Amino acid sequence: MTDKVLDDISHRRYNPLNGSWLLVSPHRTKRPWQGQQEAPALNKLPEYDPQCYLCPGNKRAQGDSNPHYKNTFAFVNDYSAVKEEQQEYHPRKDAAGDGDDDIASLLLQAQPATGRCYVLTFSAKHDTTLADMSATEIVPVIETWTRIYASHLSASHPLRDAAARSLSEIPPNPDGEVEPAKKQQLRYMQIFENKGAAMGCSNPHPHCQIWTTSTLPEEPGKELAQMTKYHREHKGRHLLEDYVKVEMAKGERVVWQNDGFLVVCPWWAVWPFEVLVIAKRHVRALVELTSEERLQFAEAVQEVTRRYDNLFETNFPYSSGIHQAPLDCTEEEAETSWFHMHFYPPLLRSATVRKFLVGYELMAEPQRDITPEQAAARLRDCGGELYRKSLQ
């Protein structure tokens, strides 16, 4: 068990996954709150909304019509953050002197970023979230993620054979497949979901985004560097493999687990009820999951989202995302990657009080009040049937 003294004193915790520190202040949980309160998401949505750009059969903003899909539907984002076609930019690489132009080139660096962005609906039903779906209903979402990831792998990728095996097991999407980027080999695929208006979601229809980029983004890049460093310094051991063993032995931050996945409030969590879903065996990417593990992963996602909603009996907002091996990588980068999923929810004390990353957190380092151990205990107590099913 964690030293009990840490439950009562301010202290810092280290995040070995990205090399950062955060401040924990458990004594502040009793402070009064007179600040901003969020409007809880209590409105009942229709199963079909004729004005929704994502519902089956509807027209999207740029004029294309969605098919009358039954489960998932993926398409190229009409407002992509990165594009394949754009004017070429060649950054200067020879700034080695002390002249004004050299200094400016050193300090004002830029690099082109290209790619392709997709939108993926989780369900045809406008009023359904992952928390409302069964594990078997979530599996097609995971299968679509897998197909899109596999279609973007480089020709020399260490996981090409695994991708071929995986695709042979997964049925094709009856509503069609998205075409991968063709102009160049992309470096990384970031799958993420912003759920709820509090997290900036612009459409309540259940969906996620998939951005494929020519560069390795900052967060997965830092994690990959840390995992590679750990692997080199500890005779081939894996950082998250060892972390899973530590958390399973201690138990106090474990929220839920099955044979394939561990759900924890990590030691280094920044957000009040932050959760990390980690593969128990060395899975480097979606394409290495077996059919049984895809179901186990779906169960883990269902458990997290359902417990979130049960915690404050509201449609719990969060941002979530998957980190896995890059689309184009070396043997070492593939070997040191470990499949995991982050959940970052903002709610702190109730359905109306959220955490803000401001002030000290922006100027110094992240800070939290409730400890990860306390958060895990509360989430463990929120299992069972989704609260709103008893209200129907």
Curated annotation (Swiss-Prot):
UniProt: Zn(2+) binding residues: 52, 55, 126, 205
Alphabetized InterPro entries for the sequence: GalP_UDPtransf1, GalP_UDPtransf1_His-AS, GalP_Utransf_C, GalP_Utransf_N, HIT-like_sf
Residues binding Fe cation, per UniProt: 223, 323, 340, 342
Binding site for UDP-alpha-D-glucose: 61, 77-78, 194, 209, 355-358, 360-361
Molecular-function GO terms, alphabetical: UDP-glucose:hexose-1-phosphate uridylyltransferase activity; zinc ion binding
Domain of life (superkingdom): Eukaryota
Keyword annotations from UniProtKB, A to Z: Carbohydrate metabolism, Galactose metabolism, Iron, Metal-binding, Nucleotidyltransferase, Transferase, Zinc
Cofactor(s) listed: Zn(2+)
One cellular component (GO) term of this entry: cytoplasm
UniProt cofactor note: Binds 1 zinc ion per subunit. Zinc binding seems to play a structural role.
Active site per database record: 207
Protein family: Belongs to the galactose-1-phosphate uridylyltransferase type 1 family.
Subunit-level organization: Homodimer.
Protein name listed in UniProt: Galactose-1-phosphate uridylyltransferase
